[in-house]
Amino acid sequence: MPPKAAEKKPSTGGKAPAGGKAPAEKKEAGKKTAAAASGDKKKRGKTRKETYSSYIYKVLKQVHPDTGISTRAMSILNSFVNDIFERVATEASKLAAYNKKSTISSREIQTSVRLILPGELAKHAVSEGTKAVTKYSSSAK
């Protein structure tokens, strides 16, 4: 027996009833879906991962032009460079804080390299760094 006009209709489980406002709701939903679909179709660019691979490769070719390097070895060297960079930056930051300065200068970098790297390696790193800063300063003028 169909329900009378005065009686309440049983819930349809969240679904829209067959008559009334359903077509209008579908049109609105259709518009939203179309907008969302066009947003979904937009391709996301690959997130770029910054590495030192190209620079490591260039140095390798300067030193040993006929030698190659595996992906795993490149990954290890990249991790090594990141680790040393982080250690030097952290130490330079501490040195600047000790001296109540808000700027890290070449002096802090040089001191942190001397503290982090052992003996002869530190001497070579400092001399190469000084040479690089001098070259940069002369080319900037």
From Swiss-Prot:
CDD domains the record matches: HFD_H2B (cd22910)
Flavoprotein keyword on record: no
Gene3D superfamilies, per database record: Histone, subunit A (1.10.20.10)
Gene Ontology cellular component list: nucleosome; nucleus
Composition skew (Low complexity), residue ranges: 11-22
Keyword annotations from UniProtKB, A to Z: Acetylation, Chromosome, DNA-binding, Isopeptide bond, Nucleosome core, Nucleus, Ubl conjugation
Cross-link (Glycyl lysine isopeptide (Lys-Gly) (interchain with G-Cter in SUMO)): 8-9, 26-27
Localisation: Nucleus; Chromosome
Any GO molecular function: DNA binding
Biased composition (Basic and acidic residues): 1-10
N6-acetyllysine PTM sites in chain numbering: 8-9, 15, 26
Processing and modification events after translation: Monoubiquitinated by the ubc2-bre1 complex to form H2BK123ub1. H2BK123ub1 gives a specific tag for epigenetic transcriptional activation and is also prerequisite for H3K4me and H3K79me formation. H2BK123ub1 also modulates the formation of double-strand breaks during meiosis and is a prerequisite for DNA-damage checkpoint activation. Acetylated by gcn5 to form H2BK11ac and H2BK16ac. H2BK16ac can also be formed by esa1. Acetylation of N-terminal lysines and particularly formation of H2BK11acK16ac has a positive effect on transcription.
Cross-link (Glycyl lysine isopeptide (Lys-Gly) (interchain with G-Cter in ubiquitin)): 135
UniProt region (Disordered), positions on chain: 1-49
Family: Belongs to the histone H2B family.
Role of this protein: Core component of nucleosome. Nucleosomes wrap and compact DNA into chromatin, limiting DNA accessibility to the cellular machineries which require DNA as a template. Histones thereby play a central role in transcription regulation, DNA repair, DNA replication and chromosomal stability. DNA accessibility is regulated via a complex set of post-translational modifications of histones, also called histone code, and nucleosome remodeling.
Complex formation: The nucleosome is a histone octamer containing two molecules each of H2A, H2B, H3 and H4 assembled in one H3-H4 heterotetramer and two H2A-H2B heterodimers. The octamer wraps approximately 147 bp of DNA.
Cross-referenced PANTHER family: HISTONE H2B (PTHR23428)
Protein name stated in the entry: Histone H2B
UniProt gene name: htb1
